[in-house]
Amino acid sequence: MTATHTDGAVASEPAPRHPLAVASLIEKHAATIAKADAAIADRGYWSHFPESPSPKVYGETAAADGQAAFETYLGGRFPLEQPGATGWVATERSPFGVALGVEYPHSDVETLVTAATAAMPAWRDAGPDARTAVCVEILTRIHEHVFELANAVQFTTGQAFVMAFQAGGPHALDRALESVAYAHTEMKRHPATADWEKPAGKGDPLRMSKTFHVVPRGIGLVIGCNTFPTWNSYPGLFASLATGNAVIVKPHPLAVLPLAITVKYAREVLAEAGFDPDLVQLAPEAEGEKIASTLALRPEVKIVDFTGSTQYGDWLEQNAHQASVYTEKAGVNTIVVDSTDDFVGMCRNVAFSLTLYSGQMCTTPQNILVPRDGIDTESGHIGFDEVAAGIAGAVAKLVGDDARAVELTGAIVNDGVVSRIGAARSHGEVLLDSREVKHPEFPDAVVRTPLILKQDSANEGMFDSEWFGPISFVVATDSTAQSLEIFRRIVGKKGALTAAVYSTDESVLDAMEDATLDVGVHLSCNLTGGVFVNQSAAFSDFHASGANAAANSALTDGAYVSNRFRIVQSRRHV
C-alpha cells in the first residue's frame, strides 16, 4: 500500500553535535584505513566492526536504545531534510506482519540530480585522503546506531534478529570499509604531483611541474534490494562516494528504512565536516513511479549499482549506456557430491545453508548433484536415496521446533516466494515438504520451512533456472563426471555466485576447481564445520566474480572501484 501526502512539515534533522575538522578526521581514521589497506592485500582474517550483539561488546543498554530509536520512526515521517521534497511516500510492509507506516520525503528527479551535481566540486577538491576519512567517519557514525539499523533490517527484510544485526550491520559495514580501502588504494596508485625534467642536449633541461587530479565520473545511482538492503548497497555507495561522486540511493520499496537511516547519518557527517549533505540523497519511489529507470538513463548518472532480478539487471546493462553499470543478478548455485569422510557433518552443513533465511540469500545452494549409484563415506558406500534422506533429515531436524526454526528461517520476504514454493512442488518428488510455521513472537509473520525435491538428470529443464526461496533439488546423475558436465552447462549459461563440492578424491576436487574456473564461480570444498557456502568474509572472500551471468562485478576488487573516477592532469613549466 502506498500513501502520498503533501501536507505538513518534515521533522527537522538534529543539529550537528559538533563541527568536524577534516584534518582531524584524517588523523583519527589513519590507523583504520592503513589496516584496511593491508587487509585487502593480505586476504587474511580482519574485521573492524564486532559481529556479536552481546552487551559485553556494545554495552548493557545498546540493544534497548537501538530498538527504541527504531520504534520512534514507526507510523511517522522520517526526519530527513532533502531539497525539493514535494510529498511523502510509504510503501513498506513487514514480513513479520508488524505495522511500519514510515513515510519518506519524495523529491522529483530533476531536483535530486541538480542538487547532487552542485555538491560535487568541493567534494572532488577535498582529495582522496579527506574523502576516505569522511567515509570512514560515516561508517563509524552508522555503527554507533547499529542496533537501530539492525531492527530496521529485521522488520523490512524478514531476517531473524541476529542475522539482521550481523549481515545488516557489522558485515555490511566491513564490506563498505573494504570498498573504501580499495578506492583509497586505487586513488593513491598515482602520485598527486610530479617534477619532470628531460635533458635537452647542451641547453637547459626541460622542466615541468605536473599535477594529477582524481576526478569523479558524475552521479552514482545505488538501487537497493529487498533482502539485503545494506549489505548489497554499501559497497557501491561508499566506493562511489570515496572516489568523489555524489550518490543517489534508490531503496527497494519494501526495504526503505535501513537505507533511509544510512542516508540520514551520512548527510549528518557530511554537513559536520563542511561538505554539502546533498552528496548523499534518498530517492524513495511512489507506487508505479519507476524512478530507478528514470534516474538510470539520466546523462548526469555515470555509475549504477544494482542488486536484483536478472530481467531488470539486463535492462540496465542494455540501456544505461552513459554509465558504468555494476549488477548482481540471479544464478543457479550448485553442490556436487562425490564422496565424504564426514557424512553427518556434510548433511548438517548443507542443511544449515538451505535453511538460513529461508533460502533467500543470493548465495544459497539450489541444486545438489549426487551419483544415482551413491557415494563412499567414512562408514562405507551408501545409496542415492540415503544421501538425499540424510540432507532432508538434517533440514527437518533444524526446523522441527518452531521457536528454534524461526531464528534460522526468519520470514518470507514477499508473496512471490510463497507462490514459488507452491509451484515448485510439481517439479519433482517431494523429499521434504515446506510447511507453514506460526511465529511465537509475531503471529502475522509469513514463515515457511524449506522444500526439498528429488529429481533426475534427465529432467534438467526442471532445475536449470533459479528458484528463489527455500527450494532445492537433490538430483540423481549417472556419475560425478556427469554432475560436472551439468554444473558446467547450467552455470555456464545461467551463472552462479557459489559452488561447493564434497569429495575425498583429490582428482575430483581438482576437476571441480577446473570447472569453476571455466565458468567463473567461487568454490568451497568439503565444508562440514562452522563455515558455510552461502557466507563470505569481507577483506578475504570475494563475493561474486564478475566472470559469469550472475554478476558482472565482484565485491570487492580493484576493478569495482577504479572505473568510478578518472585521472586528469595539468602541467606547467618550471
Segment roles from a protein language model:
Residues 66-69, 110-114, 121, 132-147, ...:
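Long amphipathic alpha-helix in the N-terminal Rossmann-like dinucleotide-binding domain
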Residues 187-347:
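Rossmann-like NAD(P) dinucleotide-binding subdomain of oxidoreductase/dehydrogenase enzymes
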Residues 2-83, 163-164, 168-193, 211, ...:
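C-terminal segments
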Residues 99-104, 118-125, 201, 221, ...:
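Short, well-ordered beta-strand elements within core beta-sheets of diverse protein domains
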Residues 84-129:
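Structured, charged N-terminal subsegments at the starts of enzyme catalytic cores
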Residues 258, 375-386:
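Short, flexible/disordered intra-domain loops and linkers
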